[in-house]
Amino acid sequence: MIDTVLPGSGHDIPAGCREAHWPLENLTLAGLSWHTSVDNEVRPPVLMVHGWLDNAMSFKKLAPELAKYAGVHAIDMAGHGHSGHRPPGYGYWLMDYVADLSELIDHHFPESERFPLDLVGHSLGGIVCALYAAAFPERVHRLVMIDSLGALSRSAKETVPQLRKALQKKRNGSAPAAVYSGVEAAAKIREGGLSPLSPEAAGLLVPRNMRSMGDGFVWRTDARLRHPTALMMTEEQVQASLASIQTPTLFVRAAQGLLANHNGLDKRAELIPNLTTVDVPGGHHCHLDGDTAPVATAIKGFLFND
């Protein structure tokens, strides 16, 4: 891991943590690392992975609580925050995120071969962490999924229409980048997204996803993140991956989250052999927005009760 403070980025680095870089073979992941006095040989670190179009600041409130017990590293996934973008011609497939996480752990957290680490993922990050835990159970001590319980699925008959849609979008490309007068204007737009945020939460999350351009600001996030993926998992594949998770797992279910009324959720939950479910108040960003204490209490109790 390479510790740095990026020029001009100090406004979005919370007290008690530092900017970090983790070089991979084809790009460099950035993120935030929270200081702890706990020896990694006593308590393995916690890796935190955010949701789609978010960044490491998603864990600004939760990470300091966990750092009282272990080293905490929140990554910006590829194409998000301060991390590198995929090369031209490439997209952002789900399994590529899992490959990034695998490479990150292998190269920068080799101690996990002896002391399995903890994974905490929100939304897409929870999906990525769950797939990694299914593939490499020996490297994961405990898994936490916040408002996340397996990948979005499509029926097999939707394979070709999905492929067509993805290839057409790849050929047509992205729309020109919107330019905002200030970060606050972009944050206002983000408040009304698919998963709405309060002004406070949007103000915490958005600056790390922005960069200056001329007299204004544009999204730093890769526009290709909004392109449809060419291939999605079937429900049978999702269920098989969840059934392969051997590590103790916590599902944090938000009362007003995206999964609150999701059909088929009980079936997925039943497939994970060692699953604990906790219900918390709040929306999809229950770990960042509003009263986050119930989420922090549940996760601390789950991760550090041994």
How would you describe each model-predicted region?
Residues 134, 142-178:
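Flexible "cap/lid" loop of the alpha/beta hydrolase fold
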Residues 35-84:
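Conserved HGGG/HGGXW glycine-rich cap/lid loop of the alpha/beta-hydrolase fold
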Residues 13-14, 25-27, 32-38, 73-120, ...:
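Active-site loop/oxyanion-hole signature of alpha/beta-hydrolase fold enzymes
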Residues 283-292:
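Catalytic histidine-centered segment of alpha/beta-hydrolase-like enzymes
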Residues 1-46, 67-70, 109-113, 300-306:
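Alpha/beta-hydrolase fold catalytic core
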Residues 175-232:
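Conserved alpha/beta-hydrolase catalytic His-Asp/Glu region
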Residues 246-283:
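Conserved loop-alpha-helix segment in the C-terminal half of the alpha/beta-hydrolase fold
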Residues 121, 125, 129:
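Gly/Ala-rich beta-loop-alpha elbow adjacent to hydrolase catalytic centers
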